[in-house]
Amino acid sequence: MQTQVLFEHPLNEKMRTWLRIEFLIQQLTVNLPIADHAGALHFFRNVSELLDVFERGEVRTELLKELDRQQRKLQTWIGVPGVDQSRIEALIQQLKAAGSVLISAPRIGQFLREDRLIALVRQRLSIPGGCCSFDLPSLHIWLHLPQAQRDSQVETWIASLNPLTQALTMVLDLIRQSAPFRKQTSLNGFYQDNGGDADLLRLNLSLDSQLYPQISGHKSRFAIRFMPLDSENGQVPERLDFELACC
């Protein structure tokens, strides 16, 4: 069986921001528990980048709008024959609950911004080698605390993002499930189509081809060019089958 690689590409700025936030939150938990300097720097660097993303836009406002939009979409299915009504109603209630929690939560990321250790590490991350023990003795001593004490603090930091994480997970799940994958074929490594007001492109490509997509465009129209991973010797077939979902 062929191994399929999933590529996702945002077609607007809000989706680009959401995918970056999702990626960074996932990265926070990859190397847990934090047991050494490398794991700590990975964690704090992702926290810092996450706070940078939060400062660039109205993340909460856009998410609340999307939660409301998804509720309205689901309400159009109420009463439609053959549709699982209990599932629809449960999703609507979950969206409402996520919105209520998000709107009543403190400013997104504020708890992390106000943490002294996070602030000290953030100041040094842009300096090459700036997180040595003599630059950050506070981080050095923190790494020598009992593991359980560090774990508890990390859990508290991550938990402060729960209102955002829960709302974002629901929104992205619904968007990803909003359109099925359909087989498409590129000619000479190129494919273009209308986006149909989509927010996100999802593309499944066989690993055997050792190709990757370069995607450009916006919600009304997009283009995909397939490129060989080996830029010198790799080849792009005249016809290439792949699966595409416009969500």
From Swiss-Prot:
Keywords, alphabetical: Cell cycle, Cell division, Cytoplasm, Septation
Disulfide bonds: none
Annotated InterPro entries: ZapD, ZapD_C, ZapD_sf
Compartment(s) of residence: Cytoplasm
GO BP annotation list: division septum assembly; FtsZ-dependent cytokinesis
UniProt superkingdom: Bacteria
Gene3D superfamilies given in the database record: YacF-like, YacF-like domains
UniProt key word Cell wall biogenesis/degradation: no
Gene Ontology CC entries for this record: cell division site; cytoplasm
HAMAP family, per database record: ZapD
Function: Cell division factor that enhances FtsZ-ring assembly. Directly interacts with FtsZ and promotes bundling of FtsZ protofilaments, with a reduction in FtsZ GTPase activity.
Subunit field text: Interacts with FtsZ.
Family: Belongs to the ZapD family.
Protein known as: Cell division protein ZapD
